[in-house]
Amino acid sequence: MKIFLDTANLDEIRRGVEWGVVDGVTTNPTLISKEGKPFEETIKEICNIVQGPISAEVISLNFEGMIDEARNLAKIDENIVIKIPMTPNGIKAVKVLSKEGIKTNVTLIFSPNQALLAAKAGATYVSPFVGRVDDLANDGLKIVEEIMQIYENYGFETEVIVASVRHPMHVLEAALIGADIATVPFSVLEKMFKHPMTDIGIERFLKDWEKYKTGR
């Protein structure tokens, strides 16, 4: 399974890339706004750090605006993926962009039916929001499982990005059902490294080594 970072923070992205476990990045207007830099400047800087898919979201909600923004964003770097909201205009835009060879990521997916429509339009990726679905007292990972089954049934090549990840268990469950990608906040990536027994083991090794060196 591929792991993307869901952030626009350059320091977090650099650290994840240095660890060797980050395959791509997803951003959205909220994440970009937190960094206090111009939109395109931030996207370009991310492209310089990550050699993999980088999702940049359109702001327009009308069809023509989405197409114009998408074409301009796609010129920034060959790794740019255009993030499009799951709306009728969005799906219409995905159909046009896919024919032009522009990669797309349909976001704000909350049902298998939405994912089916996105795949039929030619989306490169879909992003089901598992955390937000969980908030509604539903099983977010069940929706991912159903989406993947539909894609397998009909041979869709659209990849599933598990989004709105809240904790490492979401990543584990996504991996167990065979999701293509999980996009995670940096805080979740950090937690994936940790286990109390690992810390205890390291502490014991260090104590034993110190005793060995001092002959005690």
UniProtKB/Swiss-Prot annotation:
Its main location: cytoplasm. Gene3D superfamilies: Aldolase class I. It catalyses: D-sedoheptulose 7-phosphate + D-glyceraldehyde 3-phosphate = D-erythrose 4-phosphate + beta-D-fructose 6-phosphate. It holds the Pfam family TAL_FSA. It is an enzyme of class 2 (transferase). Keywords: Cytoplasm, Pentose shunt, Schiff base, Transferase. The keyword Transferase applies. Pathway: Carbohydrate degradation; pentose phosphate pathway; D-glyceraldehyde 3-phosphate and beta-D-fructose 6-phosphate from D-ribose 5-phosphate and D-xylulose 5-phosphate (non-oxidative stage): step 2/3. NCBIfam families: fsa_talC_mipB. HAMAP family: Transaldolase_3b (MF_00494). Belongs to the transaldolase family. Type 3B subfamily. This is Probable transaldolase. It comes from Thermosipho africanus (strain TCF52B). The lineage of its organism: Bacteria, Thermotogati, Thermotogota, Thermotogae, Thermotogales.
